[in-house]
Amino acid sequence: MLIEAIAMPIVDDASHEQFSKQPRGSHPLAVGARKRRVVWPDRSTVIESYGSRPPLNSLAKEALEAYVHWGFKNREDGQIELACAPETEAIIFDSNRHGPIESFKKLSDVESPSSVLYGSESDLSPTWFEKQAEMLGVQAEKIDGSHFFLFEDIHRAEKIIRSHFLRSSDE
């Protein structure tokens, strides 16, 4: 099951070349990661802050609480800090410009029943998901919500996942 998967088809040689030649450190997600606040007084302060602004303000309360619970570690001074250092996250976002393209190419190797789901309000191009589905021989399914649609309504997410796995087991 691919859910808002970052597997990007090559649209044309010019866009591929432009994408792969962007200078290191310029990816917007890497820039944002490097600006993250590392140390916080407590988890409730993080929940209040993250839950008050995009993109995490769209998450269900229990999803945001789980994200903060597992995404931060306790410090000896009583405060908490990000479990993943901002620079580590930035390196992941900025490391391999070919990753999404190579991931897309590997979709043709998938032999198991698959699904491709994406959010109706995603900031990613629907074309990505339609092309992924085409590679897998399935229809892309648009779900109401953002890039984080799976975490916006936990009960709906459970139903979506169960229905797709049950459908896959029947194939």
Question: What residue ranges belong to the model's regions?
Answer:
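Short, solvent-exposed loop/turn segments at secondary-structure junctions
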Residues: 6-8, 72-73, 120-123, 146-148
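Flexible "cap/lid" loop of the alpha/beta hydrolase fold
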Residues: 1-38, 125-126
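Catalytic histidine-centered segment of alpha/beta-hydrolase-like enzymes
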Residues: 145-158
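Alpha/beta-hydrolase
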Residues: 33, 37-115
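Conserved loop-alpha-helix segment in the C-terminal half of the alpha/beta-hydrolase fold
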Residues: 104-146
